[in-house]
């Protein structure tokens, strides 16, 4: 039996819209849309006895209740508190209706009336203000008391003299200010003709005295640093600086880095250091045996053609199967040395079509640095102009007159000081560890001691007796042979010239100790 496929029902809102008018809504859809579920009824009945308005518990949207939400960081809302009203600093004007201006009703214009409107006749109110009343207060000046001036009269016929007292002048304050702009191209003589011994022009004043003068004012001269010229006898040795390869090596460094990055790639190019000095002058002699012109230096890419059937061993094993050798490239190592590089191509594999395949090889050699010698201080040799010295013996020498007849030291010596005791040698010689040789060169007697071959190393014990010297065997005298007691090798070998009495035992007489094994 096949199980029926379950079809998902539409949403409760869409079902409620279509079934509400027909009255065929399912009870779950009706309760959910109209908020009549068991949970909604519990909240409705419980809210009648308990107030949860501030908590925002309801079936509606979350608005925080009637008072809203409290922002974070602020305290709770105080019940019954009055907010503080901020009053403006200026007194606001009262806003009200404007003054009502009455407007007269105009009579209707008759057809027979004139169309000219007189401008002087106006029955409307005057919008401009009327006559303005001006009030001026007059303050009288201070009353100056009158001063009686005495009048002098005389009966004589002379002229009358009137003494008039001057009026007192109030004190006045005068302030003088000046502004000066310096113009270096124009100078104005601000003083009159200078007097004797004084000159004043602009800002430069020169006061002279009996011994000298000093400049006052003006711009002080800049002091420049003077260079001291060294004399012929004092000089400085400059430290050697590393030579610069180029003035602007930016582009060359980038080019060298590109070349170096391609040659030093160990994943694609084989790195082979070369110690043979022929790599710098004649690298072709490292690939094959040939005659090269020592005067000609080839700096182009060299191609070596060789038949694979005719195999030849190269002079250097590192240059085996080299097909081409590139031109020299110069670069700088991290240690600061100059590196000479050549890129080679091997022909290790040959396909049926005739193509030759091989890896790339980077041959390089680092050149040693040329160390600069430490500078030494040189001295002047010979005589130069201005260096001649004239020595005057009469003026620089000192002569002391010595009286030979009078000897002040002769009084301390007695006549016995000139005796033969002064000629005696009081030194003591020590001849310990010395050898005394008497006579000249004499003939010496030489005896040859035969060498005895033993199992041990040969040793000789010689003694120097009565001035004879024993030398080691150089020429053997066959006439003097040692006579053995038996024709075979002796059992015991005794040194005839040895006084210590040592001997050697024949190896056949030594008994060997056998190892005893307890457990077989």
From Swiss-Prot:
Function: Minor protein of the capsid that localizes along the inner surface of the virion, within the central cavities beneath the L1 pentamers. Plays a role in capsid stabilization through interaction with the major capsid protein L1. Once the virion enters the host cell, L2 escorts the genomic DNA into the nucleus by promoting escape from the endosomal compartments and traffic through the host Golgi network.
Alphabetic keyword roster: Capsid protein, Cytoplasmic inwards viral transport, Disulfide bond, DNA-binding, Host endosome, Host Golgi apparatus, Host nucleus, Host-virus interaction, Late protein, Microtubular inwards viral transport, Phosphoprotein, Viral penetration into host nucleus, Virion, Virus entry into host cell
Coiled-coil segments on the chain, per record: none
Lineage of the organism: Viruses, Monodnaviria, Shotokuvirae, Cossaviricota, Papovaviricetes
Disulfide bonding pattern of the chain: 19-25
One Pfam family named in its UniProt record: Late_protein_L2
Protein known as: Minor capsid protein L2
Main location: virion
Post-translational modification, as annotated: Highly phosphorylated.
Subunit structure: Interacts with major capsid protein L1. Interacts with E2; this interaction inhibits E2 transcriptional activity but not the DNA replication function E2. Interacts with host GADD45GIP1. Interacts with host HSPA8; this interaction is required for L2 nuclear translocation. Interacts with host importins KPNB2 and KPNB3. Forms a complex with importin alpha2-beta1 heterodimers via interaction with the importin alpha2 adapter. Interacts with host DYNLT1; this interaction is essential for virus intracellular transport during entry.
Motif (Nuclear localization signal): 1-10, 511-519
Membership in a protein family: Belongs to the papillomaviridae L2 protein family.
Gene Ontology biological process terms in this record: microtubule-dependent intracellular transport of viral material towards nucleus; symbiont entry into host cell; viral penetration into host nucleus
Location(s), subcellular: Virion; Host nucleus; Host early endosome; Host Golgi apparatus
Keyword Magnesium: no
